């Protein structure tokens, strides 16, 4: 299918300015890397997402979905077909102790809305930079909390564009993983069940977690957060630090001097710089400690020709 034709058709379906050709995806990731998307669309509602999916299915066009790009490395060759950004699907409603949040809402914002309504349970998320959809996809967590602890159900869209409601059990949550890595469902909204609490206590906990994050993590540079999952009975950052890898640099990307579990873009790094550094760290840690570090960050897209 000619991508010009795809662009022209989708421009009639989505609002003006929400369909682009050859969009640089580095503008849509936290680490500021990524090549071009053939066609980039940013739907504003579920009907528009359905229209994109049905059109793509009809002509067998590959579709890739993005949240806010906080935990993903997009390769320098970009993404073929249609890239769908969900950052405009951001509605949040509160009813009693229940919060329903759409996929593109920032999980940080949802935690603050919970605070404003004196609801406890999402304090751990006050520093997680991902979207609600991304948080469910990887069962995001921090400081002892996880999305799976407060999620009750979610609305998803199948690869055929049908809406379904799934209970938490269907997600098959594990440590930094869910069933969504292996199926073609798109997370549209999540329902969180929280508990009533005291504003001052909730805020104090969030302030404490924010202080810990700011003091320990290299927030002054672009990064994708923790690169590796925590290995059993150990910590990735500790193993990397004890391997003498802090400050190790490939191209414009280096292992953070502030937190060894992070890789930061210090000088116009590329996706390939990140990937090469990840492989180097994995190889070094395995040789030194016999531990295979598993990536937490997703890598998608095509290599640069």
From Swiss-Prot:
Q: Which cysteines are joined by disulfide bonds?
A: none
Q: Which GO terms describe its cellular component?
A: cytosol
Query: Any idea which GO molecular function terms this record carries?
Result: FAD binding; UDP-N-acetylmuramate dehydrogenase activity
Q: Where in the cell is it found?
A: Cytoplasm
Specify the pathway.
Cell wall biogenesis; peptidoglycan biosynthesis
InterPro entries per UniProt: FAD-bd_PCMH, FAD-bd_PCMH-like_sf, FAD-bd_PCMH_sub1, FAD-bd_PCMH_sub2, MurB, MurB_C, MurB_C_sf, Oxid_FAD_bind_N
| Protein name per Swiss-Prot or TrEMBL | UDP-N-acetylenolpyruvoylglucosamine reductase 2
- In the UniProt record, the gene name given for this protein reads murB2
